[in-house]
Amino acid sequence: MAATDVRPKITLACEECKHRNYITNKNRRNDPDRLAMKKFCPNCGTHRVHKETR
C-alpha cells in the first residue's frame, strides 16, 4: 500500500558532501521527476542544492 502512496516520504541529500539532511513529502502527481531544492547544509555551512535520493 505504501508503494502506491500519492505523497511518499523522500530524503534530500546535499550534492557536495552527500549528507542526507532533510526528509519531506512529495506529491507524485505534481512532481513525477526527481526533486531538487536549494536548502541549508549544516555540514557544509552554506546553502547548497539538495536532490532526492532513492
Swiss-Prot record:
Q: GO molecular function terms here?
A: structural constituent of ribosome
Keywords, in A-Z order: Ribonucleoprotein, Ribosomal protein
Q: Does the keyword NAD apply?
A: no
One Pfam family assigned to this protein is: Ribosomal_L33
- Asked if the record carries the keyword Ribonucleoprotein, the reply is yes
PROSITE patterns, per database record: RIBOSOMAL_L33
The record, for SUPFAM superfamilies, names: Zn-binding ribosomal proteins
What is a single cellular component term in the Gene Ontology annotation? ribosome
Record GO biological process? translation
Concerning its family, UniProt says: Belongs to the bacterial ribosomal protein bL33 family.
Q: HAMAP family per the record? A: Ribosomal_bL33
Q: What's the protein here called?
A: Large ribosomal subunit protein bL33B
Name of the encoding gene: rpmG2
